[in-house]
Amino acid sequence: MFEAVEELVAEHADLEKKLADPSVHSDQANARKLNKRYAELTPIVATFRSWKQTGDDMETAREFAADDPDFAAEVKELDKQRDELTEKLRLLLVPRDPSDDKDVILEIKAGAGGDESALFAGDLLRMYLRYAERIGWKTEIIDSTESELGGYKDVQVAVKTKGGQGATEPGQGVWARLKYEGGVHRVQRVPATESQGRIHTSAAGVLVTPEAEEIDVEINPNDLRIDVYRSSGPGGQSVNTTDSAVRITHIPTGVVASCQNEKSQLQNKEQAMRILRSRLLAAAQEEAEKEAADARRSQVRTVDRSEKIRTYNFPENRISDHRVGFKAYNLDQVLDGDLDSVIQACVDADSAAKLAAA
């Protein structure tokens, strides 16, 4: 299983030499790329060295145990350590999502259920904002359309690590956690507008895309159609007397992004381009993932974005994730941002599926 690790150890040593050369840092973009790869390999190399050392220590202990039975317990303990390191190394060798270090743009759309769905979209927004606050991420509402009762028909939020340029540690970006949130979220509760106390079911859709930098996506200006219009508020009333809202269409793919929250047309255009870049990057990645998934579909089912991924049942205070069979009765805490146990269940299931396929 670990034949390829020796090659990674050699690559790690080569990167260490390159990064020690001051001339390498004159090209900052290349230096960042080398540093990122070095950081990715460091835990693999460290664990592999511990694994090898434990194996050597175990052989030595076995030799001593032949003459001194007191060493038998040490052999047993070292054997246990080696098994643990073997499993840790297997996990480290699972192919990583290249976007795990990235920040994200999270979009919540009200779905079936009218006003109640829009109110639920607002609850989801608050949940994600609270979760980000707990972790120390930064959030920025890019664009939103409020409903008449105070919910959201549509809201887009940028979620960033503290530095605002993705994670400094490999695999610790916002995407690594929030990518499992994409899909249809269903709510079961008595709506505020329900006079007879009947439980209703409604839903809101969540779309999560890794935020793309300009270097990630090349966009030809000739492929864009830019439309301007007046901003609108709840109920569709105009809130601006100038055509400051912007809608950008990427003609080759039909991908559309719009923004109306900023005060000027230029600011709205910049935000719309930001959303468009992330959507185009996500579309390209999904196409690549689809091709890879077609080849392995018969072997493994991984956690992915699918319809009705989660149910929020208010009468029972229950949260259920249907993809991984997760169920807990702390819905009030989850909606207050205590999402880690739900997300970790998805992370663990995804890792297990990838390990089984490796």
From Swiss-Prot:
Pfam families: PCRF, RF-1. The modification N5-methylglutamine is found at Q237. It is found in: Cytoplasm. Keywords: Cytoplasm, Methylation, Protein biosynthesis. The keyword Cytoplasm applies. InterPro entries: PCRF (IPR005139), Pep_chain_release_fac_I (IPR000352), Pep_chain_release_fac_I_sf (IPR045853), Prokaryotic/Mito_RF (IPR050057), RF-1 (IPR004373). Methylated by PrmC. Methylation increases the termination efficiency of RF1. GO terms for cellular component: cytoplasm. One of its GO terms (molecular function) is translation release factor activity, codon specific. Peptide chain release factor 1 directs the termination of translation in response to the peptide chain termination codons UAG and UAA. Belongs to the prokaryotic/mitochondrial release factor family. NCBIfam families: prfA, PRK00591.1. This is Peptide chain release factor 1. The lineage of its organism: Bacteria, Bacillati, Actinomycetota, Actinomycetes, Kitasatosporales.
